[in-house]
């Protein structure tokens, strides 16, 4: 859900065998018009310090950018349209969306020379899914049969198993996966780096592999991870997968802020910045011309509401809050008009996105908002707004929202609760917040389901739940293609009627790069820059 994809597959009558998936949009990846250069050379990428480099231990977008070069998970997403295609796998098949058979490439090795087998994937997944390991990507494996035995719900209870019962190694290159329930999006899920394989050395000593990862991707780590300074990758000459690396070396330079990284890019001290600050968009466009891009993003910001608090229990009040917010004015003032005001629960690059799913609920209408607010009985007590200090713009737009709620609804007392990201996350997860909060969602794969499951999971931060909503999501999970999307859209409609999360705006990502490099492909669906495709011109 952090940092990082229509349904993955076309509907099939009996058997789904995947070698490629249906196109699902017209979003083109970012790349320059000049022709690719020759293989060789080195280039640098600006990055914020990752938290981990072991795939199952991280969901951070900063880590995932590095892992994109180090590991090949079973599947990948096409940067042109988000469709799913094999990567470390060569095919997958199912007859019921429950039992899946994965066939992997033969003749591939890890960076230490160990052969990559079906067991390498099973071992990695079991390690990530085992609750006591406390790996960050644990929940990505919750769809697989046996997950609950590895993650008992009772406090202090011990797991009754060490491995997922739904995994069965059939032979050296074949893995059978049994899910707990039908899930047609499963191949798309397999593109997430946590599903990459691990060698025996990594499962035996994950702490060592976390700082010196041993992957199966086109690049290997070169030297030590210099914390808060740099990470160097070198071409893996033994790579036998489908991604042929062009540059010999990739240097990740670590910066503490995007603003500093942008200054370094202007000075020629780094070659690629995939997160140009919104405030610098006009300057970046002027300086870099065709080497600057604004591309679609699946990332959304919401205002979450604690619906179990009696003050927020009435959906009319929640709609009044939404209609009192001037999304266009805020995005113009704070994000230079780069971010798009939300008209849906999901990003506009997502297959099945509807341009006006939210309707009048997301339209700025202070008069109608005040009428709804009064009909709902108004609001008692101070309104506390919760957000993190991770980005200065969060406080800026929360201040704008506070002023608009004061002016348009007459809520006079508003208090800010700004705190460190980890503290805010803990507060929200424990349900101890006393008011609305910033909720962000970064897609893992381009499906409406990813938003629905990510925002409205059992025990979610808003406290909202509905059995009919759950049934609609489950119906979509059991289907594929247009049938799945139709069920997910009905679930989205219900969530927008109840509005435990108020959609605010859809991010748009900005990137720029130096004239030293060509063939820059920045993926709106996955982990940013395609490291293997970049060529160096000098």
Model regions: which residues?
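Detector for C-terminal structural segments
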Residues: 15, 325-352, 393-403, 425-538
